[in-house]
Amino acid sequence: MDDTAPIDWKRNLYIAWLGCFFTGAAFSLVMPFLSLYVEQLGIQGHEALNLWSGVVFSITFLFSAIASPFWGRLADRKGRKLMLLRSALGMAIVMALMGLVQNIWQFLLLRAALGVLGGFVPNANALIAIQVPRNRSGWALGTLSTGAVGGALLGPLLGGYLADTFGLRPVFFITAVVLFICFLVTFFFIRERIEPVREKGMLSGRQVMVSLQNPHLVMSLFVTTLIIQVATGSVAPILTLYVRELAGQTDNLAFISGAIAAIPGVSALLSAPRLGKLGDKIGPERILVAMLILSVLLLIPMAFVQSPWQLAVLRFLLGAADGALLPAVQTLLIYHSSHQVAGRIFSYNQSFRDVGNVTGPLLGASVSASFGFRAVFLVTASVVMINAFYSWLSLRRKSNRELVSEAE
């Protein structure tokens, strides 16, 4: 293949979307029965089972947060395609090994390894972000985000069916095959023109931030990513219990809870490309602030709903707003960083996202234990409202600085 030929960024986008879909599906395939597998490995008793289930779930995000900056640095040196291949193949091997474990410690170690070797989605975001024309980046990143969301929606349904049909362990092997397909698709169809940077010429993490035109804004975007994940995860531990409180006695609690849990993903699939395209026209910063404010306005009434269907409608609308948030953040990150450091900027953002994935459920569980289920939505709304104000100030400061520069 001619390395000087122009890269078809749209083809790369669609292939990366497929890879993100496979990765999202693979990760979520095992989620419906994670606690059951922990129990199968010898953990007995309600408290012990809850504790170990929480630990094996969280440890993946913790190790991902630690490892992401290292992989981002390597991506800036060796290219993003190599990181995609490393991630897909590494996760495939780890998933296959998970199907062979004999005790909880082996499983815990492999869940940590999964976090270390992960990172397909942020590297796909970085790859597409630096290849796409700037005036199409909102649409492109919004479209790409629907891949992982779509996979994450399908995964639990398929995983539950496969576990019921074949048992728990075979699902890990099936997941490994899905990830290996992702590796093959990436290897044969993704194209990248690499401009290698020597280790000697690499900037340190501090130098990367100093080299940015607006490091304060970039840091505020990292914080926004963290808050988005905190807001998403804070409801997860209490959602089924809250639905049970709203529904009363019902025979299909699992179905209703599952539908209400999944419905934001459906609306995010519909909204992300459209709002991303709108962001290309009016500016991603306007989309970001508007959707943060809309999220606050939707979270508050969730604390006062009287039926599961009222909650479902609000969560559908919230998903439409949430679907635009991370693509808007990623678009702004690429606007305010050079291609030479894009890998690390996206990896730092992933670390903040992973921290949010861990702290969100902890916040929700602690607030609900102290003040009840409804308080979780009010506390989450307060956190998002503070972040919306902080984001507005940061973006306004950036706009004022640009006006001063133009005047000079």
From Swiss-Prot:
GO cellular component: plasma membrane
PROSITE patterns: MFS
Subcellular location(s) per record: Cell inner membrane
Membrane topology: Multi-pass membrane protein
CDD domains: MFS_MdtG_MDR_like (cd17391)
Keyword Transmembrane helix annotated: yes
A single MF term (Gene Ontology): transmembrane transporter activity
One Pfam match: MFS_1
UniProt entry keywords in alphabetical sequence: Cell inner membrane, Cell membrane, Membrane, Transmembrane, Transmembrane helix, Transport
InterPro entries, alphabetized: MFS, MFS_dom, MFS_MdtG_subfamily, MFS_trans_sf, Mutidrug-R_MdtG, Tet-R_TetA/multi-R_MdtG-like
TM segment ranges: 13-33, 51-71, 89-109, 112-132, 138-158, 170-190, 221-241, 253-273, 287-307, 375-395
Primary subcellular site in the record, as a coarse category: membrane
Family to which this protein belongs: Belongs to the major facilitator superfamily. DHA1 family. MdtG (TC 2.A.1.2.20) subfamily.
HAMAP family: MFS_MdtG
Protein's name in the database: Multidrug resistance protein MdtG
Species whose genome carries this gene: Dickeya zeae (strain Ech586) (Dickeya dadantii (strain Ech586))
